[in-house]
Amino acid sequence: MSLTTLGNHPKEEFALVEIATAILTEHKEAMPFSSLVQEIQEFLEVDAETFKSRLSQFYTDLNTDGSFISLGNNEWALRAWYPVDAIDESIHELDDEEDAPKRKKSAKKKVNVFADNASDDDVIDYNDDDPEDEDFGTVTDDDTETDDEETEVEVESDDESNEIDLSDDESIDANMTELSGGDDLDDLSDGDQEK
């Protein structure tokens, strides 16, 4: 399918993946994603802002569609161009190119940080005080004194207003009956009989 074949139908009806397939088929080589997007945008004759809203979905479709393959460095090609063995080799070639310029690192000196040798600067001495603690000074017993004397608080009580007259049982029972809804279910001491 080429761009000329796509020209027979309205451009809006085509999926971006179909247009990308036609563009890659016409170019017959892998293309960077940005170039592919630019050509699709030119084919659809839309401005950048309109196309930008569809860009993330297009990239997702490009990844999930089985007919495209990423060759690294954001270059895309048609999977049909590469047999399965060649795909694996081309990907490993890219990995080998990235690995080649690395230099060997010199071996690091191992240090036992718990050693008893006090002359070594790398040894951690857990018995030393933290130097930041010295900024605040030492705490003495005078600074932490608390009042050992108990403070008495006088509470005035109004005995008459808080006391209940226990001699008037009938008024208490009437109030209790009023609060409980009138049914005396569990108290048989007031003369009620069990039914």
UniProtKB/Swiss-Prot annotation:
Residues 120-172, 181-195 have a biased composition (Acidic residues). One of its GO terms (cellular component) is DNA-directed RNA polymerase complex. Residues 14-81 form the HTH HARE-type domain. Keywords: DNA-directed RNA polymerase, Nucleotidyltransferase, Transcription, Transferase. Gene3D superfamilies: RNA polymerase, subunit delta, N-terminal domain. Residues 120-195 are annotated as: Disordered. Belongs to the RpoE family. RNAP is composed of a core of 2 alpha, a beta and a beta' subunits. The core is associated with a delta subunit and one of several sigma factors. This is Probable DNA-directed RNA polymerase subunit delta. It comes from Leuconostoc mesenteroides subsp. mesenteroides (strain ATCC 8293 / DSM 20343 / BCRC 11652 / CCM 1803 / JCM 6124 / NCDO 523 / NBRC 100496 / NCIMB 8023 / NCTC 12954 / NRRL B-1118 / 37Y). The lineage of its organism: Bacteria, Bacillati, Bacillota, Bacilli, Lactobacillales. The gene is rpoE.
